[in-house]
Amino acid sequence: YIKNSFELRFPDEDDVGADYGFLDMNGDPNKGLKRVIDFTDKSSDEDFIAHFEEYFNKQYTLRYFLLVMGLGMVDNLGKNMMLDTWDGQIFYPRFYDMDTICSFNNSGVITFDTDIEMEQGYWNTSSSRLWTRVRDLFHDELVVIYKDMRQNGFDYDTLMQYFYDDQIAKIPESYYNKDFDVKYGPYATEYMGIANGSAYEHLKRWLKRRLLFTDTLYDYAPSYADSLTIRANTTEPMTIEIE
């Protein structure tokens, strides 16, 4: 089943043989993809939690998952995901491409709203054995990591800078018009749905709402004020506990 479902990209199969990296690496049963898949599929919940770091880089994998959730990257838990390893034992998920991000499907059509979840079946591999177990068994750790991400760069302003200021804004509007004339205008009835221009206003709305929704999944309550006012209707001594 592994040979039919996975493709070795590097090193080239012509150089190392078709089984390298799939069943085991150079005959070593303690390395390779089959070892990881068997662990993911067959381990008990207790063993999955206890031994996860013997198979995956945990911090990296959980952050990858949260990034995919936060940006609605519906193909990046399977079809558009690769697995990297440097020693044959510890694996890292990696983006293959990111064309399904911030509401778009892989044809460039605005498809997904801001409140999508895996449980609803929107992700290409919504029932993935790996990712459903990561989601359910590491939820408390995901909450902690998500808070760290949100407070250190994974925020609306920073994402808009990367997406829009550093990239989209550098493309003149006239280029979108010329692109339309060549690619979409002659085939308007078929491709009009993906002639979105810069999609600037849509991106602003979608990204802001998606982050707020994902915050609810991981118990994050952002504060947008630098001060807090509390009114107490009593003259008695009070104690306030802030977590």
Question: What is each residue range found by the language model?
Answer:
Residues 1-15:
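Conserved ATP-binding subdomain of kinase catalytic cores across diverse folds
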Residues 21-78, 82-235:
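Middle-to-C-terminal accessory/interaction subdomains
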Residues 235-242:
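Short, ordered, surface-exposed loop/turn motifs in non-cytosolic proteins
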